[in-house]
Amino acid sequence: MYSNLKICVIGDGVHSKRIQKLLIQKKCDFEVFKPKSKKNFKKENLKNLKEYNVIFISSPDDTHYHYIKELYKFSYIFCEKPPCNNKENLKNLLKIKSKKIYYNYNYRFSKIFKLLQKKNKFKLGKLLYCNIIYGHALGLKKDYKNNWRSKKNKSPKGI
């Protein structure tokens, strides 16, 4: 069914594993490009990414802009949020006129969103106010200090 697609997943962390699992469930062939691997730092390997027609970017945040900038002309791109870490790169992304770039914004699949959709079922009346704080509490976990999100040069705004 998807045999004509050349799919690549950039990154091999938690979000990448979720995407890989979905691709396996859909019986899609794909390759994983691991940016931290020494062999993948070579420029010719980045050129090889241009051969794929679908690319999922789930690498560390500070790499997203670079991959988008290099690959958007060649592939459909699905990028985990955020697409960049600074205003200059954001301005440059806004200049790209492509209908082939998509960004993950998955709050619409959260349980609270589903509950809000069902509010009419219970005839509770109008929702007057709602304050939702959503996160994964990485800053509270033991491995946060070793995570790339705690490094100011890679994630200037933190998590």
Where are each of the predicted segments found?
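Predominantly a Rossmann-like dinucleotide-binding segment in NAD(P)-dependent oxidoreductases
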Residues: 110-159
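N-terminal Rossmann-like dinucleotide-binding module
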Residues: 1-40
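Hydrophobic anchor at the start of a short beta-strand
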Residues: 7, 29-31, 77, 101, ...
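Local beta-strand N-terminus motif with an aromatic residue
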Residues: 52-55, 74, 124-127
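Short acidic low-complexity segments
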Residues: 39-52
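Beta-strand-loop-alpha-helix segment that lines the small-molecule cofactor/substrate pocket
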Residues: 54, 60, 65-108
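Alpha-helical elements of Rossmann-like donor-binding domains used by nucleotide-donor carbohydrate transfer enzymes
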Residues: 18, 54, 66, 92, ...
